[in-house]
UniProtKB/Swiss-Prot annotation:
Membrane topology summary: Multi-pass membrane protein
GO molecular function: metal ion binding; phosphoric diester hydrolase activity; sphingomyelin phosphodiesterase activity
Keyword RNA-binding: no
UniProt keyword annotations, A-Z: Cell membrane, Hydrolase, Lipid metabolism, Magnesium, Membrane, Metal-binding, Sphingolipid metabolism, Transmembrane, Transmembrane helix
Top EC class for this record: hydrolase
Source organism of the structure: Homo sapiens
GO cellular component terms given for this protein: caveola; cell periphery; endoplasmic reticulum; plasma membrane
Family: Belongs to the neutral sphingomyelinase family.
Protein name: Sphingomyelin phosphodiesterase 2
Entry superkingdom: Eukaryota
Entry's Gene Ontology BP terms: ceramide biosynthetic process; intracellular signal transduction; response to mechanical stimulus; sphingolipid catabolic process; sphingomyelin catabolic process; sphingomyelin metabolic process
Site description Important for substrate recognition, residues in chain: 180
Catalytic activity line of the entry: a sphingomyelin + H2O = phosphocholine + an N-acylsphing-4-enine + H(+); an N-(acyl)-sphingosylphosphocholine + H2O = an N-acyl-sphingoid base + phosphocholine + H(+); 1-O-octadecyl-sn-glycero-3-phosphocholine + H2O = 1-O-octadecyl-sn-glycerol + phosphocholine + H(+); 1-O-hexadecyl-sn-glycero-3-phosphocholine + H2O = 1-O-hexadecyl-sn-glycerol + phosphocholine + H(+)
Length: 423
């Protein structure tokens, strides 16, 4: 690779709002999305909420002349909704399904059935290795009473760990998707602090689009105005994040969002705004790479966010244990009721009533049993994430005890050291 190596990457990301039978004008929006992607010819198009296999196959066929490589990440009952279209050959593919993803009995929210995940594709571009990730985290629904906060923090940590452990051979790391978190939210801070990823909106030299880079805006006719009432300018929950590793430098030359309507058609492509980033990658001495520098000033916010995440997971675990305990009491009461019904039926005094109550009592016990098992699984999932955070915090304390010099390699899993050894 030449010392003056330089590469331009054009990236597109959109939550397509492609729920079959529920999303308005879905077929028309998919058609216009395909036309737009063919016209712009991005290097990578990473999409969320393409729930329908028919929609994916339609886009795949329509985009094949411009984007010969495509993949649909399937998981859960109705699918993850994640798919990618690439102008360049995809060398490797994998995906990771999040351990925690809401509650199956919250059917009206539906996140549990989708199998939320993160997809990874590896590209080799002019001798450079690019790891591109696409993801969609659990929705918030109610910011004041967010019952999914612990799950979203656990997902953010799981995502950060997945990126950390799969990107050690990468030169450039790219993450796009609907994180369902505001920039200042705990999960978003945890993800960026632990991985060292940079926010394209904050880093760009040239921004065009909606105010404050928001990706759900009041101007969009598909967005619930009631949900955005506390946020008059909208919210920013979709991101393009990136970093360079091992002697490379990456910068965002331009970043653009759609603005809630299509000037040619009037209706937007989705209820979310599309993100378009132009990134430049070039050679740079390792010490000049901002993503590989972790001095004492950067460790303090990282430690704070790790501790805060540990606490939030603990609160979620306590809540999950409470529900599991409640379910166990219901199981006990249900079994006692069944025993009583058996006695009544055997005695013949109230046999008909006992028979009538038998089926709902069995249903109650089965429902409570499923409820108990699910929340026990939730406790274990939260405990696993909290234990990993506890280990990281313990390593950080060990690093601090080694002396006044910063020990970022210990805290960050010696990622840069491993990379240097491999080279």
């Amino acid at each position: 690779m030449k010392p003056n190596f330089s590469l331009r990457l054009r990236i597109f990301n959109l939550n397509c709002w492609g729920i079959p039978y529920l999303s308005k004008h879905r077929a028309d929006r998919m058609r216009r999305l395909g036309d737009f992607l063919n016209q712009e010819s991005f290097d990578l198009a990473l999409l969320e909420e393409v729930w329908s296999e028919q929609d994916f196959q339609y886009l795949r066929q329509k985009l094949s002349p411009t984007y010969p490589a495509a993949h649909h990440f399937r998981s859960g009952i109705i699918g993850s909704g994640l798919c990618v279209f690439s102008k360049h050959p995809i060398q490797e593919l994998t995906q990771h399904i999040y351990t925690l993803n809401g509650y199956p009995y919250m059917i009206h929210h539906g996140d549990w059935f989708s199998g939320k995940a993160v997809g990874l594709l590896v590209l080799h571009l002019s001798g450079m290795v690019l790891n591109a990730y696409v993801t969609h985290l659990h929705a918030e629904y109610n910011r004041q009473k967010d019952i999914y906060l612990a799950h979203r923090v656990a997902q953010a940590w799981e995502l950060a760990q997945f990126i950390h452990h799969t990107s050690k051979k990468a030169d450039v790391v790219l993450l796009c998707g609907d994180l369902n978190m505001h920039p200042e939210d705990l999960g978003c801070c945890l993800l960026k602090e632990w991985t060292g990823l940079h926010d394209a909106y904050l880093e760009t030299r040239d921004f065009k689009g909606s105010e404050e880079g928001n990706t759900m805006v009041p101007k969009n006719c598909y967005v619930s105005q009631q949900e955005l009432k506390p946020f008059p300018f909208g919210v920013r929950i979709d991101y393009v994040l990136y970093k360079a590793v091992s002697g490379f430098y990456i910068s965002c030359k331009s970043f653009e969002t759609t603005t809630g309507f299509d000037p040619h058609r009037g209706t937007p492509l989705s209820d979310h705004e599309a993100l378009m980033a132009t990134l430049f990658v070039r050679h740079s001495p390792p010490q000049q790479n901002p993503s590989s520098t972790h001095g004492p000033a950067e460790r303090s916010p990282l430690m704070c966010v790790l501790k805060e995440a540990w606490t939030e997971l603990g609160l979620g675990m306590a809540q999950a244990r409470w529900w599991a305990t409640f379910a166990s009491y219901v199981i006990g009461l249900g079994l006692l009721l069944l025993a009583l019904l058996c006695v009544l039926a055997a005695g013949g005094g109230a046999g008909e009533a006992a028979i009538l109550l038998w089926t709902p009592s069995v249903g109650l016990v089965l429902w409570a049993g499923a409820f108990y098992l699910f929340h026990v699984q939730e406790v274990n999932g939260l405990y696993r994430a909290q234990a990993e955070l506890q280990h990281v915090l313990g390593r950080a304390r060990e690093a601090q005890d080694l002396g006044p010099e910063p020990q970022p390699a210990l805290l960050l899993g010696q990622q840069e050291g491993d990379r240097t050894k491999e080279q």
